[in-house]
Structures are given as structure tokens and as C-alpha cells.
Amino acid sequence: NWAVDCVADYASEKTGMQISVGRVNLEFPLDLGVEDFKMIKPNDSLPQVRDTVADVEKLVVSVQLMPLLSRQVEIDQLELRGVNMNTTDFIHEARVKGTVGLLSLSSHGIDWGKQTIIVDDALLSDANVSVELSDTVPPDTTKTPTYWKIHVEQLNVDRTRAVVHMPGDTLQVDAYLGKAGVREGTFDLYKNLYRVDNFELADGRIAYDNKFMTRSRDIIDPNHILLSEVNLGIDSLSYAMETSELKLVMRHCALKERGGLQIADIKGPLSMDSLKLKMPQLLLKTPDSWLKAAVDMDLNAFSDSCPGRLSLRANASLGKRDLMRFMSGMPAPFRRQWPDK
């Protein structure tokens, strides 16, 4: 631990930050354990104030030594517990801060020469993160290409919340993942191609809030959306950034909206790019209604000038309760006399 203190002092001197380590020890069998790691820097606006960049209760790491000689990294275990973080001014585009209960991963296949990463298993749990985007950063025209390819065999996220604040805090997106999982994900950072074989979400919650718009009394307020009890299953999810092409197969989707609308299930394939949306086998169910449809729509179908085409074939059975949610402005006698079936 004396040597660790010397290294921490040297790092503090070189970085201009206060870096300290409470204790270093060996974890069974031969893993390195670090406790009470702290990194503190002066505030970017108030030098007399200090910001905690990182405060880690415990870090455990096990890395194989021999592969390092051939520029490969084999991580048997990497585990962080009790993390408090704040990126302060390190990332100009955004400030990320929050807490992480547990972050762990194992990775056997990090190759610096080939620029590939294989993550065998990763877990993030009990995290609460806030992302504040900045509107004062000019675009970076000096970025160098990133050729890394990342393959994730299994990623689980439990009891985690993330809040994104748009510049000026005009818009806010709040997402909670009760239990989420990704299987067989491939991410090509150079070609901007992303693919996930399977995505599952249980007990999710999503809120979208436009703070500059007053709340509407409509069944669904597009400026203030709150979805709860979100359960989702997606197969064959892919996205190509260059063409804006999105493809997926919705296996199941259920949710509740704050205004009373409840979706019991949505399923079917979907494809979308910058010009067109296709849902050839859409099935939508609520507790009282169902809809089967085939949709082929140009995204400019409702444009005032030169509108595109819309093709829709549908069969449906609509229950009274669902219809009445969209007829709240109709006279009460009219709504009462509407037949139940």
C-alpha cells in the first residue's frame, strides 16, 4: 500500500487532480482488489470548489498477463461497486453524472492490432445516471476514424435509470429498465452498423417531457408522455446509420400510457429508412380491441406539397372503452348510448 500511495501521488501531480486509494489487496484466488478509490479536481468555474470525478467503493480486476505481450487483453473479471461519477468538463458535448451499484464484465478477445473487442458477459445494476447535453460545442471536424468492432455475447441491465436533458433543459427523456437483456450484439463503429439478435425488457418505464409546452387534456399528450409497465421483446434488430435503415421483428410489446390507453400486445416485422415505413404483418391488441394490418407508407405521405403514397389493408374489432377514450369531447348522452359491441 505504500507503493500504491506513491503511484497515487505521482498521478495526482501529473493530472492536477487529487487521486487517492484507501487500500489494495489480493482477492481470492489472485485478483487485485482496490478499495476507496477517489479522483477529485477543481471546479471548472469555481477553483475553490472541488468536484468528485470518481469515487469507487471497490474495484476488483483479473487480467491475464501473457496475452498483453501480443497486444491482446484477456479480462477474466472486472468489477466496480459503489461508483459515484461526474465527467465535469472532460466531455465537451455532455456532462454525465450519477451512481452505479455494480458494473461487471468478462472479456476474452480484446485485440489492439485488429481493433476488435469481444465481451463475454456484462452486467450493470442499480445505476442512476443523468446526461446533460450542451448546446455550446461547435462540431468537431478533426475527428479521426474509429475502426473498432465490438461483439457482445450477453449484456444484462437491472434496476437502472437514465435521464437525458436536452440543451437548455427544454426536453427531458427519462427511462427506467427494471430488467433488460441483450444477446449477440455486434457494433461496427467505422461503418456505423449495429445489430442485436435479441433484446428483452421487463418492468420498464419511459417518460418524455417538453417543459415549454402546457399539458393537454387529450387521451395522449405528445409533449408529455409517460409509459409504464413496458414489456418488450425484439428479434433481429439492426440499424445502418448511413442509410437510416432500421429493421426489427417485434415479438411482443405491452405497456400502459398515463392517459389510460393500454396496449396488451404488438407484434410483427418492421422496416424503416429515411423514405419509407413498412409493417406487412402488424398485430395490435388492447384488452378490448384488436387490429391486423399491412402498412406501406412513404414518410412524406401527409406532406402539403407532393405527398407520397400510403397503402393500408386492415381488419379490426374496436371495443367501446377504446373508442370512448378518443371521443371525450363528444356529448355525454352520445357516449352513453354507444353500443358496447
Q: Where would I find each of the regions flagged by the language model?
A:
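Beta-propeller and related beta-repeat scaffolds in trafficking/envelope systems
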Residues: D51, L80, E93-G98, L103, ...
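Short, surface-exposed beta-strand-loop junctions and turns on beta-sheet-rich folds
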Residues: I40-K41, P138, T170-L171, T214-R215, ...
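Flexible beta-edge/linker motif
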Residues: G22-S134, P145-P167, Y176, G181-D209, ...
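N-terminal type II signal-anchor transmembrane helix
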Residues: N1-G16, D44-L46
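Short, surface-exposed beta-strand/loop "edge" segments at domain boundaries and coil↔beta transitions
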Residues: V163-H165, L171, A202-N210, L255-E257, ...
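Short beta-strand segments that buttress and anchor functional surface loops
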Residues: D36-M39, R251-L255, P280-T286
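Strand-loop-strand
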Residues: S274-K292, D296-R309, M324-K341
